[in-house]
Design a protein with these regions (language model features):
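Single, function-defining residue in the core of a domain
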Residues: 1, 15-22, 27-31, 46-47, ...
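DNA-recognition alpha helix
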Residues: 1-9
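Conserved beta-strand elements of the Class I
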Residues: 49-51
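Short, positively charged patches
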Residues: 69-72
Length: 321
């Protein structure tokens, strides 16, 4: 018998780059979504997904022709290019769910958050975020989408806090509040700062117009002392007190740190800090690809841990915390 062996010649770097340019980064987004659907997360908190939202800056290859990603480093005094990643992360299942990539100059974390919330398919989700996401618009968007939120706000004494004009006690509390948002400036509105909050035309709020001049916002505020400290933390949420106690609100917020740890793993363990591409669309492909790799790693680790070992001791994976 005569065997014909055909030599396989690998594609050149140029050919690979040209082939990548034909693929949209949305394909990778689709793959991530399908992966999460194929292996639905099973760790829930009282039936809810706990989803942290946060942002992280990512340095990318310098390109002076792209002003949206170009900025000057304050510490180093030189020009750099950077993306800002707005990410949602399932903290109980170690799973990336979504991301919105923005140029460093067009960064808008608040808008990115409510877009991510509205794109999430399940209503049984609690979105957890830090103080930079605490706006009336964020709260209204999440409520309108039928989801739940738990956001840390600046404390009652801060001049820029959402809570500053309410007559609140300087102690731990768990209270229901409501406020009417408006762009009108009548004497009646000005005389009732606890009932009304005036929004200037420069303040972004998407639910007031000429047909709907007012918007009533209902929410809950939980204030508690930090462990071993005299300082207070304040949390705003639309979660019911009948379903979630004050201590559970505190516990849920503390899970947010999982997303901070995930950024470290994504950038260094999954090597996102060393992208190969220079084109902005190709870099976004790599961002989604690293998230897919991250999720696959934790899905595999989760199944290994849950599998009953035949031997005496339980096997543990170094991938799981």
């Amino acid at each position: 018998l005569i065997f014909s062996i055909t030599q396989i010649i690998p594609p050149t770097a140029s050919a690979l780059v040209q082939a990548r340019s034909k693929i949209s980064s949305r394909v990778f987004q689709y793959i991530l979504n399908e992966l999460n659907k194929a292996f639905p997360p099973d760790n829930l908190y009282k039936g809810y997904h706990l989803i942290a939202v946060d942002g992280s800056e990512m340095q990318i290859p310098l390109d002076f022709s792209d002003p949206d990603t170009l900025h000057k480093s304050a510490s180093k005094g030189k020009f750099l290019s950077a993306f800002h990643l707005n990410v949602s992360y399932d903290v109980l299942n170690h799973r990336y769910l979504d991301t919105i990539v923005q140029g460093i100059h067009s960064k808008n974390e608040v808008e990115a958050m409510w877009k991510i919330v509205e794109r999430f398919h399940d209503d049984n989700a609690i979105f957890i975020a830090d103080r930079n996401y605490a706006t009336w618009n964020t709260m209204a968007h999440i409520i309108q989408s039928g989801k739940s939120f738990l956001i840390r706000v600046k404390d009652i004494h801060s001049i820029s806090s959402l809570l500053r004009k309410f007559n609140l006690p300087d102690e731990e509390f768990d209270l229901d509040l409501h406020i009417t948002l408006t762009r009108k400036q009548t004497k009646d509105i000005k005389s009732q700062p606890e009932k009304y909050r005036f929004l200037s035309t420069t303040s972004t709020f998407d639910f007031i117009d000429e047909h709907n001049p007012e918007y009533v916002l209902h929410f809950r505020v939980v204030r508690f002392k930090l462990d071993g400290s005299e300082e207070y933390e304040s949390i705003i949420t639309n979660l019911s007190r009948d379903e979630f106690s004050k201590d559970e609100i505190k516990e849920i917020y503390n899970t947010r740190w999982g997303i901070e740890l995930s950024f470290r793993d994504l950038k260094f363990s999954a090597d996102l800090c060393a992208v190969h591409a220079k084109k902005r669309e190709s870099i976004q492909q790599e961002i989604w690809a690293r998230m897919i790799l991250y999720n696959i790693s934790f899905i595999m680790a989760h199944h290994i841990i849950n599998k009953k070992p035949k031997g005496k001791g339980k096997k543990k994976s170094i991938l799981m915390r």
